[in-house]
Amino acid sequence: MAELRVFADADELGRTLAAEVAAACERSDRPFLLGCPGGRSLRTTYAALEPRRLDRLVAVLMDEYVPVPSPDAHWSCARFAREEIGAPETWLPDPDEPDAYERRITAAGGIDLFLLASGASDGHVALNGTGSARTSRTRVVELAATTRRDNLVTFPEFASLDEVPTHGVTVGLATIADARALRLVLHGPDKRAAAARLLALDRFDPTWPASIVHDHPDAQILVDRAAHPAS
């Protein structure tokens, strides 16, 4: 079962997690593979990262829309990584060769730390929606309507649900669980229900994919007070 850590607010959470990422990266004697989501949840963490301490960092993006958008499109994960993470090196899965992403990760020694977020309405993690198999690997998936609605908030430039892509390429739950450590972030009142659902579980439940954190020996759930169910 994942350990719970509670912070005063999203900024404190982000600073603390960023310091842990930087320290782990500095200790690494090889490229440090950091699994990274796009979207709102990790923004305070990325903002607090110190570029001077991250020369070995490789940002391993967990997903991308299909068809792959222009790297300048507002919904492009490549654009998000460039503007928000700023790692020296960034990897993205290729929908034409999803298995190659798994091989690349394995050949580089595996993901050292996977940062995670949970969908507010359906607990999706990366683009793994309700019912995703625990054994799933990088693949192209059709996005659930709940995931697409959540992405209207993640990418507010979408004018309507009709503009949100219907497919994406995503790492699988087994890809995530293979990482050496997992840190799942929930902050703000709009994530309180998701936090309550996740904290009510003590093992993986395929109806709430983010619960993969409960099936890992080094996993933490980081919430701020606004997201904590008791607040």
What are these regions (language model features)?
Residues 1-34:
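N-terminal glycine-/serine-/threonine-rich phosphate-binding loop
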Residues 26-52:
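Glycine-rich N-terminal segment of FAD-binding domains in flavoprotein oxidoreductases
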Residues 27, 52-53, 105-109, 168, ...:
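Solvent-exposed alpha-helices and their adjacent loops that cap or buttress functional pockets
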Residues 36-41, 118-119, 187:
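Glycine-rich beta-strand-to-loop/alpha-helix junction loops that act as flexible
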Residues 47-54, 79, 130-139, 201:
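A glycine- and small-aliphatic-rich helix-loop capping segment at beta-alpha/alpha-beta transitions
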Residues 54-117:
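Ligand-binding beta-strand-loop-alpha-helix segment within the catalytic cores
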Residues 124-171:
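Class I SAM-dependent methyltransferase SAM-binding "motif I" and its flanking Rossmann-like core
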Residues 171-174, 178-231:
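ATP/nucleoside-binding phosphotransfer catalytic cores, i.e., glycine-rich phosphate-binding loops
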